[in-house]
Amino acid sequence: MDLESFLLGAVYYYGLFIGLSNFEFDWNTGRVFTKKWSTLYAIALDSCIFALYIYHWTGNTNIVNAIFGRANMLHEYVVAILTGLRIVTGLFTLILRWYQRCKMMDLASKVVRMYVARPQVRRMSRWGILTKFIFGSITDGLQMAMVLSAMGSVDSQFYLGLGLQYWMFVILNMAMMQQHMIMLFVRTQFQLINTELRQVIDEAKDLLLSPRHQGVFMTKCCSLADQIENIARIQSQLQTIMNQMEEVFGIQGAMTYGGYYLSSVGTCYLAYSILKHGYENLSMTLSTVILAYSWCFFYYLDGMLNLSVMLHVQDDYWEMLQILGKRTIFVGLDVRLEEAFENLNLQLIRNPLKITVVKLYDVTRSNTMAMFGNLITHSIFLIQYDIEHF
């Protein structure tokens, strides 16, 4: 077993273990199916999570003061909003996985079958899989260390809440990892068909310059046309996968990236509070501060990985359009080959690739930079409010 197969298997079984995945598939055949034991296990575990949250919320516990000791009201609001959003997003993700189970199975079937049909994708995406796995594992590990550290400074009545918060974080992290893996496979497929498209164009150039023997020329043109039609078919499948991802992961993605945004603002404010008051005055230890900063670094680095792969998919799509633009130099080729080039070009123009969040926000570099600008502005506003009122 190679490294990427081992890592993908670990992600697959971990998703089943934590109750996020509620169906199974075979990496070797591409078959997606359900089993009684995995379905019952997911139902039991997810039901247990909801029941424990209901039980926990009936209690009256202020974990912010328990951890920070001298937290002011603004600290409590910031931490409560961030924690509450993470919990709601995690629970909503579990509900969506059951509500959209058939759609998820259909999406997984398309992705796994393309993965099986083109094994070179696995090799090309090796470093992307490894990088995401390492950063995700480190983030999970640091989150667990923070929970264990917090348990050492609070009463046992808070243990359940801390454990449930960690479980929600693990579920969200795994959900984003699954989405990232699909996007990574899509990007690798685009890179592969771009390489194939360049090869076809180079062969067409050579065909124009070589002496034309009618039988050989027609056979070669038909072969190139078949390759172009195969590229168009794969691109259409990738477009379908992207559209299905928007439908399946749209709401979850909006809540998750909204959480990243609010968490970034809150983290900037809490970092300012530590510098202003000192971690001792917030009843924090140096090890807790180091853990928190380390977790933030890998958490946001992991988020940047998720963002970068989406931007790179769009770059590969536009690169495909640029490569295809070179077809205008082909004059006098076989009619079928010319039509294959033209049909592929029309297919790309009529149905352009766009990555949106619930059709409200386009994921582009310009919008991303604008979002970072707003993040800095809102962080400054929150710090100014603290200066004026606390």
UniProtKB/Swiss-Prot annotation:
<comment type="similarity">
    <text>Belongs to the insect chemoreceptor superfamily. Gustatory receptor (GR) family. Gr22e subfamily.</text>
</comment>
<feature type="topological domain" description="Extracellular">
    <location>
        <begin position="26"/>
        <end position="36"/>
    </location>
</feature>
<keyword id="KW-0472">Membrane</keyword>
<feature type="transmembrane region" description="Helical; Name=5">
    <location>
        <begin position="166"/>
        <end position="186"/>
    </location>
</feature>
<feature type="topological domain" description="Cytoplasmic">
    <location>
        <begin position="154"/>
        <end position="165"/>
    </location>
</feature>
<keyword id="KW-1133">Transmembrane helix</keyword>
<feature type="transmembrane region" description="Helical; Name=3">
    <location>
        <begin position="76"/>
        <end position="96"/>
    </location>
</feature>
<feature type="topological domain" description="Extracellular">
    <location>
        <begin position="310"/>
        <end position="390"/>
    </location>
</feature>
<keyword id="KW-0812">Transmembrane</keyword>
<feature type="topological domain" description="Cytoplasmic">
    <location>
        <begin position="276"/>
        <end position="288"/>
    </location>
</feature>
<feature type="topological domain" description="Cytoplasmic">
    <location>
        <begin position="1"/>
        <end position="4"/>
    </location>
</feature>
<dbReference type="GO" id="GO:0008527">
    <property type="term" value="F:taste receptor activity"/>
</dbReference>
<keyword id="KW-1003">Cell membrane</keyword>
<dbReference type="GO" id="GO:0050909">
    <property type="term" value="P:sensory perception of taste"/>
</dbReference>
<dbReference type="GO" id="GO:0030425">
    <property type="term" value="C:dendrite"/>
</dbReference>
<feature type="topological domain" description="Cytoplasmic">
    <location>
        <begin position="58"/>
        <end position="75"/>
    </location>
</feature>
<feature type="transmembrane region" description="Helical; Name=1">
    <location>
        <begin position="5"/>
        <end position="25"/>
    </location>
</feature>
<dbReference type="GO" id="GO:0030424">
    <property type="term" value="C:axon"/>
</dbReference>
<dbReference type="GO" id="GO:0043025">
    <property type="term" value="C:neuronal cell body"/>
</dbReference>
<feature type="topological domain" description="Extracellular">
    <location>
        <begin position="187"/>
        <end position="254"/>
    </location>
</feature>
<dbReference type="GO" id="GO:0016020">
    <property type="term" value="C:membrane"/>
</dbReference>
<dbReference type="Pfam" id="PF08395">
    <property type="entry name" value="7tm_7"/>
</dbReference>
<feature type="transmembrane region" description="Helical; Name=6">
    <location>
        <begin position="255"/>
        <end position="275"/>
    </location>
</feature>
<feature type="transmembrane region" description="Helical; Name=4">
    <location>
        <begin position="133"/>
        <end position="153"/>
    </location>
</feature>
<feature type="transmembrane region" description="Helical; Name=7">
    <location>
        <begin position="289"/>
        <end position="309"/>
    </location>
</feature>
<keyword id="KW-0807">Transducer</keyword>
<dbReference type="GO" id="GO:0015276">
    <property type="term" value="F:ligand-gated monoatomic ion channel activity"/>
</dbReference>
<dbReference type="GO" id="GO:0007165">
    <property type="term" value="P:signal transduction"/>
</dbReference>
<feature type="topological domain" description="Extracellular">
    <location>
        <begin position="97"/>
        <end position="132"/>
    </location>
</feature>
<protein>
    <recommendedName>
        <fullName>Putative gustatory receptor 36c</fullName>
    </recommendedName>
</protein>
<dbReference type="GO" id="GO:0005886">
    <property type="term" value="C:plasma membrane"/>
</dbReference>
<feature type="transmembrane region" description="Helical; Name=2">
    <location>
        <begin position="37"/>
        <end position="57"/>
    </location>
</feature>
<keyword id="KW-0675">Receptor</keyword>
<dbReference type="GO" id="GO:0034220">
    <property type="term" value="P:monoatomic ion transmembrane transport"/>
</dbReference>
<dbReference type="InterPro" id="IPR013604">
    <property type="entry name" value="7TM_chemorcpt"/>
</dbReference>
<comment type="function">
    <text>Probable gustatory receptor which mediates acceptance or avoidance behavior, depending on its substrates.</text>
</comment>
